[in-house]
Every structure is written in structure tokens, then in C-alpha cells.
């Protein structure tokens, strides 16, 4: 009770509690919400600004990027430039052909190609590729997914573990001969498939380029929706228009299937070529590839979301390559061809050319180095026929004979062992038991004094050998001995250096690939003792070999007074007119002086006088009198080289190379020529080299100097 009473009293004393004032806490929710709204607003404004920037400022760029993701540019071929002769006649042109093409999509499978190839083969006449290999046929068979699965089941466990490429190779080996024994219709489809399969992703190849009919073009166009990647277009083929002898000089162009030759593939790829581009593979077409190559056409290919081709549109038709105008005239070239053919055929018919490998002639302009004609014919031993071989004028070399003797005189003058028009006694040169002599003085019964000029007129071997001996420090006396080969090196060098200054034994610089420089045997490859006399043979043209072009450059160098000009077959590079024909000049090929012969005017005059006297001199032994009746005044130097052979029975047959170099008119030459007729029977007395030279000079006169 007491406790209860105390609590009551205590409660009465405190009295009732007054109510406390109600306490309110400030809420943070509205602030956070407002801040969030502000951030959203700011982002929204930023988005609007960015969209505006993209749409207004950078809209074109964005549009291009979007387009680029769905549109791909593909390049196609363009016609090569044409080749014309000096008169403007087309020698090589492009023949346009309707074509059926294929552009490979990004995701096209072998099965896709197979289905398209089969459909297309039913719509067009497709010639079967004669070069279809077993591998091509097996690839065609395996393109069918069911066949691929069937062949894959034949793999061993070990073969299944191989990488993708190796496993496919193993699968190919499992295809049987019976499975690739196709019908003609299937072979047509296989041909189409092979060409389609050669295309890289988003590249275009030609399926059919010849004999495409209007009906085939129409039916392909009608069915394009069912032929993914197939289209129609235009292709070109290279056609030589005039002059069969120019075909080899012009060269060839690879096909699309051949593409870029392996040996120059990397070089061309770096220049932006594609692997299957058609390029020049020989001679003019190769030398002037970058000039003749056209600018490729450009097409836009639209892709759908699955990277399949939706459409294809040409945006740039391409541009034909630039054109070449040559220095030679097809009409003069044809005349030279006929002159060689007619004269050499007579030698074949008479048996004189039985062992001859052919006949070659080159004509140059000695004022510019321009090639006026290059003609050659190859002949097989015992044959009654000949084949065009103009390239033999600069890739085949022969022993020249006495035509080189101006080079020997030059070596004597340049090395201080010969004085001006010095007189030497023509006599047989006896080295030990060996005897070498001039044709007109084989035994010494016709010993006579000759000046340097006369030595050219009558073609003195003795004079030239004495110059060579002087280069060794020897004044000739009968029965002397000469140094062994290993001590003659500087003499070979001196003679060959002088020869090279005229163009013999060195590159002429012709604007054609594959030029030969002839054969110059080094002293390291000679017998020190038995070959000791070869240096004398070199002095009168019986040792080293030269091309017909080198001899023509030599003749031109004598004709113009000592300037060795670089020969060139291209006179200028031209663009195209509106019709694709010959346009205006882009680049003129100017004369290039490679070197000047190190002779004085007086020394060069002695050489020119000697060449003139060989034709017009009064000496009974003047070697080229047959040219005196030419329609223009001609200077010349003949050459006869002994080139015996041993036949299959072991018999030695005496043969000679009959050669000549000439130029005219003598006082101001417009043409310089070289003619080489190797390995004719030694009993040839008709001087066919002189006859051919006369006919060529007369043909030039009739065409350009009348």
C-alpha cells in the first residue's frame, strides 16, 4: 500500500504533463528529384545538340560512312593503249567483245558457286576449258555439299585431325576417277565453276569473253535475279593489225587466267595491280607496261544485311591506256622483210644455207638512234622453210668478222701505238708454227704497204694483228713468240673497250627487254698457251660475238662521226582523242648520246674514208664494190668469219658468216644498217650480204629520198 501511495503522491506533485510542441523534419526528396530532373534535362539538351551537329554539320560524312558499310567499290579492267607505226598506222589495237562476268560476294560458298554455274551453263553455250585438270574436276564435284560429306567420310582418323587446308587436300585424294567422269554438259558447268572459283571476295572475273551472242546477253540479263554475281559487260582482246614480223617485237599480253607472272608478282602488287590483271609479258608490251596499261573501271556493289550482293552499278567506265608511236614505218619494214626472205630463200634452194640458223638485218637512224627496221628469220638445219624471228636481231649473237676493224684502229690510236694514217706492211703473221694472213695475201706473195685507210678498204687482217701486237709492246718480226694468255689481259681490255665505245660487246640501250651483249670469253677460261693467238683473232673479228643490233649501232656511230646513240623503237607517247584513237603528244623520246668515241676528227675521218673506199675505191681488192651501184652514195665494211662445224658423222664442214655494215648517204647519213648471215657454205660467191644491203638502201631511197 505504501508503494502505491507514494506513486500517487508523486504523480499528484508532478501534475499533468503539458503537451510538447510538434516537431517537423525538413524533407530532402524534392531537392533530389529536382536535381535528377536537371541532369535529365541537361543530357536531353546535349543529345539534341549532338544530333543537330551530326545532322547539320557532319551529316554528309555520316551518310558516306553508312553507305560505305553497305556499298563496296570494285575495279574492272580497261583497254590497253594502242601501238602505231611512224606513219600513224595502227599496228596493235583492242578488239571489244561482249562478255559475261561474275563478281563474288563476301559469303558465297562453293555450293553457291556450283548452283549458279549449273544454272548459267543451261543458259549459254560454254566452250569446255581444255586445261581442266583432275584437281579442277574434283573441286567441282566436292562443291556439292553432299559429295563433300561423302568424301569426308572416307578420311582416316589421322586425316580428320589435320588442319582445314591439309584435310581438304586429303579429301580431294579420296575422290575417285568414276566420280569425275562427267558428261559434256557437266564439263561446261565445271569450266564456269573454275572461273567463278578463281575470283576473290568482291572481285570480278570474266566467265565468257568470245562469241557471246545477243541472245545469250539477253537471257542472262533476264535471269540475273537467279544468278547471284553474274552480269554482262565488255572485254577486249589484243590484236596485231599489220606486219607479221612486228608481232615478236610487239610482244604478248597475259590472259586474265595467267595474270601477273610469278617472277614480278610482288613488284606489281606494290604498284596496285591485282593478281589476275593482264600485263605485258614480253618486249614492247612488257617494256612499256605502265604506259599502255589503262585506268580501271569502278563499279559500286550494294550489299544487303547478310553481305549478299543486291545490285551493281558502274560509276567510272575506266580509261584506255596511252599509245605508242614507233620509229619504224610498217611499209619499209615490210620491204626489208621481203628482201631478206627472197634472198635467203635462194640460198636455201641452192643448199648454201643448209646449216645456217637464219638471216638478220637492222636499220637505224644515225642522227636520232631511232630504229627504222628490225627484221630476222630463223632457219632449222636442212629445212626448206624459215620462221619470223625479228627478236633474233638483239638476242642472238654471231662472230662478226672484219666489219669490226674500225674498232681495232681506234684501240691503236687511243693507246698511242698507231699514228694517224700510218703505213704498215701487209704480210702473213707467223707466230711459231701458226700463220694468220689477209685473204688477199695468204702466202706473202702479195705483200704490200697499206695505210690505215687502205687497211679498211681491202680489209687487211695483217694490219689489225700488227696493231694488237703493238698493244702488247711487240713490233712484228716473222717467227716471234707472244706472251701467254695470262699476260694479255690488258690487251683484251683495251681492244674490247674500244669496240664497246662503238657499241660492240656492250648493251646498246634498246628500249626492249632481254637484250644480249654477245660472248666475250674471259682469259680465265682460256688455255694460257694454246689460246695465246686468240688475241690476234679478236683484232680482226674472229673471236667475240655480237648481235646484229650492236653492229648496226657501230655503223651508226661511224656514220655520225663518233656519237654512240641509244637505239629506240618508240618515238613518242600519245594520249587518246575523243574516239579513243591517237591523240596529242605526251612525251617525245629524245636522242640520247651514250658516249662519244675517243678519237680526233682526223682519226674518225680516216675510218669514214676507209668505209667509203671499200665501196668506191679503185683498189682491185676493195671489198664492197657491189654497193657502188646503189641509188644513194653508200659507205660500208664487209666481214667474213670462218665458223666450221662438225656434223653427226664427225666430218668438218667449212662455213662462213657473211656480214656487212653500211650507211648512206655517205656525207650525211640518214640510215645505217647491219646484216648478219651466219654459217653459209664456204663456196658462196654471190656476196648475198652485199646484195641484201644494196636492196635495203635502195628501198629506203625509193620510199623517202626520191
Per-region residue spans from a language model:
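Membrane-proximal periplasmic segments of bacterial cell-envelope enzymes
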Residues: 1-290, 296-310, 316, 468-472, ...
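Active-site His/Glu-centered metal-binding helix of metallohydrolases
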Residues: 52, 403, 407
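Short, basic/aromatic recognition patches
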Residues: 63-76, 332-354
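Gly/Ser-rich catalytic serine loop of serine hydrolases
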Residues: 80, 394-404, 543
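Short N-terminal helix-loop-first-beta-strand/juxtamembrane motif that initiates sensory/input modules
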Residues: 80-83, 227-231, 349-364
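Beta-lactam-recognizing serine transpeptidase/beta-lactamase-like catalytic domain environment
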Residues: 90-93, 98, 302-317, 328, ...
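Solvent-exposed, polar/charged alpha-helical surfaces in well-ordered, non-transmembrane soluble domains
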Residues: 111-122, 218, 222, 247, ...
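A short acidic/glycine-rich loop-to-helix N-cap element
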Residues: 678-692
Amino acid at each position: 500500500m505504501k508503494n502505491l501511495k507514494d506513486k500517487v503522491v508523486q504523480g499528484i506533485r508532478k501534475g499533468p504533463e503539458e503537451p510538447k510542441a510538434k516537431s517537423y523534419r525538413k524533407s530532402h526528396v524534392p531537392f533530389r528529384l529536382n536535381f535528377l530532373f536537371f541532369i535529365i534535362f541537361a543530357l536531353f539538351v546535349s543529345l539534341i545538340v549532338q544530333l543537330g551537329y551530326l545532322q547539320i554539320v557532319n551529316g554528309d560524312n555520316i551518310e558516306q560512312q553508312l553507305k560505305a558499310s553497305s556499298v563496296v567499290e570494285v575495279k574492272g579492267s580497261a583497254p590497253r593503249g594502242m601501238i602505231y607505226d611512224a606513219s600513224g598506222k595502227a599496228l596493235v589495237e583492242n578488239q571489244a567483245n561482249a562478255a559475261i562476268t561474275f563478281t563474288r560476294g563476301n559469303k558465297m560458298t562453293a555450293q553457291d558457286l556450283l548452283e549458279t554455274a549449273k544454272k548459267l551453263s543451261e543458259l549459254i553455250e560454254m566452250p569446255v576449258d581444255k586445261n581442266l585438270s583432275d584437281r579442277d574436276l574434283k573441286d567441282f564435284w566436292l562443291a556439292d555439299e553432299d559429295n563433300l560429306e561423302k568424301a569426308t567420310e572416307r578420311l582416316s582418323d589421322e586425316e580428320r585431325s589435320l588442319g582445314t587446308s591439309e584435310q581438304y587436300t586429303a579429301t580431294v585424294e579420296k575422290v575417285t576417277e568414276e566420280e569425275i567422269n562427267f558428261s559434256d554438259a557437266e564439263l561446261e558447268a565445271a569450266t564456269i565453276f573454275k572461273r567463278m572459283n578463281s575470283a576473290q571476295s568482291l572481285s570480278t572475273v570474266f566467265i565468257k569473253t568470245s562469241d557471246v551472242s545477243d541472245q545469250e546477253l539477253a537471257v542472262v540479263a533476264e535471269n540475273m535475279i537467279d544468278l547471284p554475281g553474274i552480269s554482262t559487260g565488255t572485254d577486249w582482246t589484243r590484236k596485231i593489225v599489220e606486219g607479221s614480223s612486228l608481232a615478236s617485237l610487239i610482244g604478248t599480253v597475259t590472259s586474265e587466267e595467267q595474270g601477273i607472272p610469278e617472277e614480278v608478282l610482288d613488284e606489281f602488287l606494290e604498284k596496285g595491280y591485282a593478281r589476275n590483271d593482264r600485263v605485258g609479258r614480253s618486249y614492247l608490251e612488257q617494256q612499256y607496261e605502265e604506259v599502255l596499261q589503262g585506268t580501271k573501271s569502278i563499279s559500286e556493289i550494294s550489299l544487303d544485311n547478310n553481305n549478299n550482293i543486291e545490285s551493281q552499278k558502274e560509276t567510272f567506265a575506266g580509261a584506255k591506256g596511252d599509245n605508242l608511236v614507233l620509229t619504224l614505218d610498217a611499209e619499209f619494214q615490210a620491204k626489208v622483210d621481203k628482201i631478206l626472205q627472197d634472198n635467203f630463200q635462194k640460198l636455201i634452194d641452192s643448199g648454201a644455207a643448209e646449216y645456217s640458223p637464219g638471216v638478220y638485218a637492222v636499220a637505224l637512224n644515225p642522227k636520232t638512234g631511232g630504229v627504222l627496221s628490225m627484221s630476222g628469220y630463223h632457219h632449222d638445219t636442212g629445212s626448206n622453210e624459215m620462221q619470223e624471228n625479228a627478236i633474233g636481231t638483239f638476242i642472238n649473237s654471231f662472230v662478226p668478222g672484219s666489219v669490226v676493224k674500225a674498232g681495232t684502229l681506234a684501240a691503236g690510236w687511243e693507246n698511242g701505238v698507231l699514228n694517224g694514217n700510218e703505213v704498215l706492211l701487209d704480210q702473213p703473221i707467223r707466230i711459231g708454227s701458226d700463220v694468220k694472213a689477209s685473204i688477199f695475201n695468204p702466202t706473202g706473195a702479195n705483200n704490200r704497204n697499206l695505210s690505215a685507210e687502205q687497211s679498211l678498204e681491202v680489209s687487211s687482217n695483217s694490219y689489225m694483228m700488227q696493231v694488237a701486237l703493238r698493244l702488247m709492246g711487240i713490233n712484228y718480226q716473222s717467227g716471234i713468240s707472244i706472251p701467254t694468255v695470262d699476260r694479255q689481259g690488258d690487251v683484251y681490255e683495251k681492244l674490247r673497250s674500244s669496240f664497246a665505245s662503238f657499241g660492240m660487246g656492250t648493251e646498246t640501250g634498246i628500249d626492249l627487254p632481254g637484250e644480249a651483249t654477245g660472248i666475250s670469253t674471259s682469259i680465265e677460261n682460256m688455255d694460257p698457251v694454246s689460246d695465246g693467238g686468240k688475241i690476234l683473232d679478236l683484232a680482226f673479228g674472229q673471236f667475240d660475238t655480237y648481235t646484229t643490233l650492236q653492229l648496226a649501232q657501230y655503223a651508226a656511230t661511224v656514220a655520225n662521226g663518233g656519237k654512240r646513240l641509244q637505239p629506240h623503237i618508240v618515238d613518242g607517247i600519245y594520249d587518246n582523242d575523243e574516239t579513243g584513237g591517237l591523240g596529242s603528244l605526251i612525251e617525245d623520246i629524245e636522242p640520247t648520246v651514250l658516249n662519244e668515241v675517243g678519237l680526233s676528227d682526223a682519226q674518225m675521218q680516216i675510218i669514214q674514208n676507209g668505209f667509203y673506199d671499200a665501196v668506191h675505191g679503185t683498189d682491185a681488192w676493195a671489198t664492197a664494190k657491189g654497193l657502188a651501184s646503189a641509188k644513194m652514195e653508200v659507205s660500208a665494211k664487209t666481214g667474213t668469219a670462218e665458223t666450221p662445224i662438225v656434223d653427226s658423222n664427225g666430218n668438218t664442214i667449212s662455213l662462213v658468216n657473211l656480214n656487212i655494215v653500211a650507211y648512206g648517204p655517205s656525207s650525211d647519213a640518214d640510215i645505217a644498217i647491219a646484216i648478219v648471215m651466219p654459217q653459209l657454205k664456204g663456196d658462196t660467191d654471190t656476196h648475198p650480204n652485199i646484195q641484201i644491203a644494196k636492196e635495203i638502201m635502195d628501198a629506203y631511197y625509193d620510199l623517202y629520198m626520191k
